[in-house]
Every structure is written in C-alpha cells, then in structure tokens.
Amino acid sequence: MEALQYLARRLFLLFGALFTLIVALFLGLFTYRPDTAPKHLVTDVPETTPWEPRDILAVWDATDPLVQQGYRLVTESSKYMGPGAASEDLRYTGNNLSCTNCHLIGGTREGSASWVGVTDRFPQFLGRANEMSSIQDRINGCMQRSMNGKKLPEDSPQMNAIVAYMEWLGSDLPADQMETYRGYARLNIPEVPVDLDRGRELYARDCAVCHGQDGQGISGPDPSQGYVYPPLWGPDSYNDGAGMHRVITAAEFILSNMPFGMATRGTPRLTDEEAYHVAGYINSFPRPHKAATEKDYPDLKLKPVSTPYGPWADDFSAEQHKYGPFPPIIEFYRENYNLTKTK
C-alpha cells in the first residue's frame, strides 16, 4: 500500500511539472514578439552628390586657355567681339548683349537653353535652314539674330574658343542628365490671345526692378562693356528674327528663369499664362529688324506657329501668329500636315 501511495505522489508531481511546462510554453508563444530589425545586415552607404556642371572659375588655373577664352567671349561678348572690341575687325555682334544674358550662369543653368551637352546634339536638322546643321551654324544663328550681328568665320579663333568652352561644359555629363539641360521648360499654351494690359501689369510687378520701366536694362559702368540686366526691347536688344521674339519661346524662358534668382525650371514663380502675357508685352515693342526673314524656313510647314513674320503655310493672320491664340493654329497643322507643334 505504501508503495502505491509513493508511486501516486511521484506521478502527481510529474504531471504537475508537465502541466506547468505546457502552460509556460503556450504563454510564451502568445506573448512572443520577434525582433524584426535586421542586425548587422546594412552596411554604410556612401552619400552621393547630385551631378552639377563644372564651375570654370573654381578651376580656372587648371583650365585650357582656349576654354578660358571661350568663357570670356560668351560672358563679355560686347568687350571681346562686339561694339566694345578693340578693333573693327573683331566686332561681330551688333549690340552690347552677352551670350550669357540668355544662356544663364555661363550657359550652365537648366531651363535657359543650357550649353551643357549641347555639342553632343549636333549635327542636327534645323528647320530654319531646312538642312542638317553644325554647332557652328547654330552659334552663327544667334550671332545674326539675338546678337544682331554677323557670322563668325567657322574656323575663326572666336568660334573655336566658344565651341571648346561648350564641349568642356558637357565633357563629363551623365547620359541620364542630358534632357535636364536641354532647352526650356514646356509651356502649357493658353487658349487665349496675349493680353497686353495684363502683360504690362506683370512687367511692372516682376520685371521693371531689373530691366527698367522703359525696358532698357541696367548697364555696367561702361555701357559698351555690356549689361548687368539686359534691355528687352529697343535698339540694343535682340532683333525681330531672333527665337526670343516668338511669344511661346520667350514665355518658356521666362517661366523657368524669371524673376531672376527666384524662379527655376522646377519651381517657377509665374504661372504659364502670366509668363505668356508678359512675353507678349515685351515683344510688342520696336526692336532691330533682321533682313531677309522671308527666306527662313524654306519648308513653311516647319515654321513655329508663334513666328511673327510671314510667309506661313496657313491662312491665319499675322496678328494671331504674333499674339495668339495659338491652339487653333497648332490644330490646323495637326489635321492638315500631321505635325505636332509645340512652339
């Protein structure tokens, strides 16, 4: 009997211990929360710096003299190849603008027709000449129109230096950044014509502080040496054959860059419609005339819809080609010529 009692006690203790173990196990399962944070799996990743164009002034002493000269020519154009040049044979530009009055920050500013990577896009077809064109051809287009001057000889020291500077700017441009530095921001073209009164108000609010109420800009100590802020119309501005004389092109430039120091390609200060109206206002004033513009765009279908001078391959008025509305003209070319126009 005592042996049976002893065995019963032992079994009771055994089952009690087993029961306690099972309870503890279930409690553990229900309350367990695994640590999901990885341990020692992530290694330090070095920070990457976004690509930016090189600053020539920061590496001036180590830069090829030809590139240095190109920089001087585009940033002090009037002094070295314009009215301020030392001798008559060096005077190729007809006004006191600098190339960098439009191609901002030494041609490095995205959204201002930057030169970063531009030489890699040439030769290319240009509708104005209706042929494949070189970078030298494109530069001379600006010389004759925006700079209101004459062509640089293609093999001249000035041309070679300007091209060398442009090539230097894009020499290490990553392929995935090519489009970033191309052209201007795309304008959402308004459905309405330019409102010159609204443009005047916007100009007074946002532009006159730098360019003057009379649009004649602010020159440096010696006017023949260029401008701090360029004139936007009048005898020392771009001529009427320049791309900037087209309302859509001017509006795209304004959208990304003006007011200067406040707007960028990604963060414009003005709305699309405000940029459009002020561009029309600026281009409503007299400026130098470019001879023989009727020969531009031999294939008239390729002429931008906002080109303010004829002839055109349509029956829209000169007034509408200058001030809009442009969507009906764009639609005409889409329906009749299967062409998609953006400017």
Give the residues covered by each predicted segment:
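Sec/Tat-exported extracytoplasmic proteins
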Residues: 74-81, 103-106, 142-150, 166-173, ...
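Extracytoplasmic/secreted proteins, especially bacterial periplasmic and envelope-associated proteins
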Residues: 65, 69-72, 94, 134, ...
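Active-site/pore-lining binding-face segments in mid-to-C-terminal subdomains
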Residues: 234-299
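The canonical Cys-X-X-Cys-His
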Residues: 70, 96-107, 162, 199-218, ...
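Short acidic alpha-helical/loop segments enriched in Asp/Glu that coordinate divalent cations
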Residues: 177-181, 213-226, 264-266, 293-295
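N-terminal export/targeting leaders of redox proteins
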Residues: 1-83, 124-140, 144-157, 170, ...
